[in-house]
């Protein structure tokens, strides 16, 4: 099943604090990007990254977790198969919350989309691999 969709990305920003996180919408913003899913991993520009790889790529920027620069390295989309569940991360916006960096994510499954925020300093339950366009 081929699905084409588009999403808006906010400018890369770092948000401090706890209360405003719920007001940040990872799919609203000024940067429009369109993704056309590929059928198999390795085709096109889709790559599966592990949590460790994601951290390593972030840490490589100036020796620390990159904030604005991370957007230029990882722009996320992925393989869309509505019969499976995929977690897609959006590192263009990174949130600082209680000394932990968070990135927005969306889960795609047969029931539709859900979204939230992931901490780069914590485990991601059963989602230990992420679909990213590099």
Regions found by a protein language model. Give the residues of each.
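A binding-site-centric feature that preferentially detects glycan-recognition modules on secreted/surface proteins
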Residues: 1-63, 69-134
């Amino acid at each position: 099943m081929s699905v084409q969709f588009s999403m808006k990305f906010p400018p890369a920003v770092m948000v401090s604090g706890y209360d405003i996180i719920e007001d940040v919408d990872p799919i609203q913003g000024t940067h429009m990007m369109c993704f056309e899913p590929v059928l198999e991993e390795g085709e096109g520009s889709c790559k599966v990254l592990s949590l460790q790889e994601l951290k390593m790529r972030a840490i490589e920027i100036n020796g620390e977790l990159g904030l604005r620069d991370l957007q230029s390295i990882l722009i996320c989309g992925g393989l869309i198969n509505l019969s499976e569940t995929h977690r897609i991360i959006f590192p263009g916006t990174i949130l600082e919350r209680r000394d932990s960096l968070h990135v927005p994510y969306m889960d795609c499954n047969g029931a539709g989309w859900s979204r939230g925020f992931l901490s780069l300093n914590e485990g991601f339950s059963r989602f230990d691999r992420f679909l990213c366009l590099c």
